[in-house]
Amino acid sequence: MLSFSRARSQGRNTRPLGGGMEYLEPKRKSNVMGKIILVVSLTALCIFMLKHAPSFTSPTAFSRSEEGVTHVLVTGGAGYIGSHAALRLLKDSYRVTIVDNLSRGNLGAVKVLQGLFPEPGRLQFIYADLGDAKAVDKIFSENAFDAVMHFAAVAYVGESTLDPLKYYHNITSNTLVVLEAVARHKVKKLIYSSTCATYGEPDKMPIVEVTPQVPINPYGKAKKMAEDMILDFSKNSDMAVMILRYFNVIGSDPEGRLGEAPKPELREHGRISGACFDAARGVIPGLQVKGTDYKTGDGTCVRDYIDVTDLVDAHVKALEKAKPRNVGIYNVGTGKGRSVKEFVEACKKATGVDIKVDFLPRRPGDYAEVYSDPAKILRDLNWSARYTNLQESLEVAWKWQKTHPHGYASS
């Protein structure tokens, strides 16, 4: 059963009074008074019972601070990465509030989490759009958040070149709304989900945290603007800030509870793993590799593929290590680049399907080679990627895809 948080208003059935006054005889007065007392007594009893019922008391757990319990707001928690982060937080005994407008996320993912953690005061879902400043402020007013993990964002490079204003609004503007609420309500920690796309196409590899940020597509530019706002605010704030710039995310929950389920209309913009799986399942006739003339070993793009389980582990470590009046900026990757052709071969082995591949011209806004140097996050947070076998990560994701051919609607 989902725990939805929303304002409720109930209208009263009323009828107009007559113009005259009725005179009640003493006996009738007594009967009416008795009924009133009975109604009041029953109402009081109902209120008492409701207040002590789990479904009624659970919202108050979210509205108050509790010693030993850290309450984390996960924006975009119904999405691919956000839902995996929420799962990890819940497993680690955090209290979690998910806020999502479901434009890219899946209510099915929230239902899975609710089924795994049904206890009152563990998880709540709030349907809201972060672009609605009043709604966001209300959420912060009614909940005692200790930290915010801000994942909510549109996140397709190709789509960003076609509809840049959507990206500046959804990423930059909405982050400002969240940041204002964080400041107004004095939330202690902010973990921001950023991207390697803020670096653009650097001259040198691997990418380190001080590599100049020169994004070349609206997605990367919008994310960098959001970073800049957070960094400027942090200069005069006691808030602890962690900015995680991560690379290409793959994989899914090793126990098969969650996976990636993009909206059908967005598949053409989606991750390469999703396209590979669609081709393996026969949803599309084959895989389209865009760009074979890059200055790389085999002519295709080179990327650093990070397993989602490792990624959320980095977020939890960042949350644990975040210190007041400090900012941490970290690359989250494996430190090893893999070409698209290598990725496709790994996907063929993982699925057992000889996927048909068509090679097409480059996609606007893409860059040739991007991979990380994760030395800083290892040194500061004692984090390193564990799931680095590309084929094994794809095998785990493929198992979920096979059992969920229609995403969470298959459950």
Curated annotation (Swiss-Prot):
EC number: 5.1.3.5
Cofactor(s) the protein needs: NAD(+)
Binding-site residues for NAD(+), renumbered to this chain: 71-102
Cytoplasmic side: 1-31
Keyword annotations: Carbohydrate metabolism, Golgi apparatus, Isomerase, Membrane, NAD, Signal-anchor, Transmembrane, Transmembrane helix
GO molecular-function terms, A-Z: UDP-arabinose 4-epimerase activity; UDP-glucose 4-epimerase activity
Catalytic activity: UDP-beta-L-arabinopyranose = UDP-alpha-D-xylose
Pfam families hit by this protein: GDP_Man_Dehyd
Entry annotation: catalytic residues: 219
Cellular compartment(s): Golgi apparatus, Golgi stack membrane
Biased segments, Polar residues type: 1-13
Family designation: Belongs to the NAD(P)-dependent epimerase/dehydratase family.
Protein name as annotated: Probable UDP-arabinose 4-epimerase 3
Originating organism: Arabidopsis thaliana
